[in-house]
Each structure stands twice: as structure tokens, then as C-alpha cells.
């Protein structure tokens, strides 16, 4: 059977239902498949359906206050739901931005409700964070300690603190693990002049 005829044989309601559940980026890319798909995905009916479906998908939102700055850092991620007991939940932060800080609370949003998550240690986020396998990692300072890695497990809503002696503003995802790149210089650059 011809591929074009196979695609045309998909009932429009099934097509719309499938595409209304996809992320916006995937829908946008799918518009390039054919003129028919672009027409369907660009229709007002599909846009309204997609908006309705998007607003029913719960999302997580994290707001973190930096130590010395006038901005709050926001991270957003799809809410992990585990329909089967033995399945693994993987969450990735797909959006982050900064806003002027207006309050000092750490805020957690799940679905349409907001709540504070009590952190056992006062700390001040520094720089951008990363999300690996459902855990948000970010650099923070605390009292006399210049930097540490803070992890927040989205699924269990638990904080962990990892003390390190390196001075850097960046975490990197290396093979599923957060690493903190450090550059140590031994000697003087004058020897290379």
C-alpha cells in the first residue's frame, strides 16, 4: 500500500487526538510532513483542542531565590505520573527563566495548586541548575561554605546537599550524573610567555 494513502486513511478524529497529546515542538515539526498535515495542525479547531489538552497536563514549577541578585530562577517540568507500579519516572526541566525576585520562598507547583516545600538548610542558589532523571541539581552557597550542590528529588520531594571544595558556577550532565567542572592551575603563566 502506498505510504501517502496509508497516512490519508487515518481518521481525522484519531489524528487530532494523537497530535493534541504531543509536545508543541513535535506538533510544529510535524507541520512540515505534508500540506495536509500543515492544514490540519494549523486549523483553529486543532489549536483550541491543543490548548485544552495542554492546560489539563499538570506541570511542576520551581522558584529559587539567588543569594546576591535581584532575580528568582524558575524551572518548569512535566509532572511525573506513574501509571504502573514498576515503571520508571524520568523528568527533565524543559524551561527555565529568570524574574526579578519579589519574595524569598521556595515554591513548588503541581497541577493547579502551589505549596512551599520546607528545606532543612538555608541556602542561596547560584547560577543555572540541571534536571537529571527526575532530580533537580543546582549550585548553592551556605554561610561560610562558598559552594555546594543541592539536589531536589521531584518524585519524593526531598532535598540533599553535597559539599565540594570547587569554585564554579556551572553543573554539567555527564552520562546521567551531575558533574562540577573545575580548573586547577599549577605554577605561573609567566613561564609560557
UniProtKB/Swiss-Prot annotation:
Stored PROSITE patterns: FBOX
Residues making up the signal peptide according to the UniProt record: none
Lineage: Eukaryota, Viridiplantae, Streptophyta, Embryophyta, Tracheophyta
Entries under NCBIfam families matching the protein: F_box_assoc_1
Entry protein name: Putative F-box protein At1g31072
Pfam families assigned: F-box, FBA_3
Xref: InterPro entries: F-box-assoc_dom_typ3, F-box-assoc_interact_dom, F-box-like_dom_sf, F-box_dom
Domain F-box residue range list: 4-53
Amino acid at each position: 500500500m502506498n505510504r501517502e494513502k496509508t497516512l490519508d486513511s487515518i481518521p481525522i478524529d484519531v489524528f487530532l487526538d494523537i497530535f493534541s497529546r504531543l509536545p508543541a515542538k513535535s506538533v510544529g515539526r510535524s507541520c512540515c510532513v505534508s500540506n495536509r498535515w500543515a492544514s490540519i495542525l494549523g486549523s483553529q479547531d486543532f489549536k483550541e483542542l491543543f490548548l485544552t489538552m495542554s492546560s489539563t497536563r499538570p506541570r511542576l514549577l520551581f522558584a529559587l531565590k539567588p543569594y546576591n541578585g535581584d532575580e528568582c530562577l524558575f524551572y518548569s517540568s512535566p509532572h511525573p505520573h506513574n501509571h504502573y507500579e514498576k515503571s520508571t519516572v524520568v523528568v527533565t526541566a524543559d524551561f527555565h527563566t529568570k524574574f526579578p525576585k519579589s519574595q524569598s520562598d521556595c515554591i513548588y507547583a503541581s497541577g493547579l495548586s502551589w505549596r512551599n516545600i520546607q528545606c532543612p538548610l538555608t541556602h542561596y542558589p547560584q547560577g543555572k541548575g540541571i534536571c537529571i532523571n527526575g532530580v533537580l541539581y543546582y549550585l548553592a552557597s551556605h554561610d561560610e561554605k562558598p559552594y555546594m550542590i543541592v539536589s531536589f528529588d521531584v518524585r519524593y520531594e526531598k532535598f540533599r546537599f553535597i559539599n565540594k571544595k570547587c569554585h564554579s558556577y556551572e553543573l554539567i550532565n555527564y552520562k546521567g550524573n551531575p558533574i562540577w567542572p573545575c580548573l586547577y592551575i599549577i605554577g605561573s603563566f609567566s613561564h609560557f610567555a
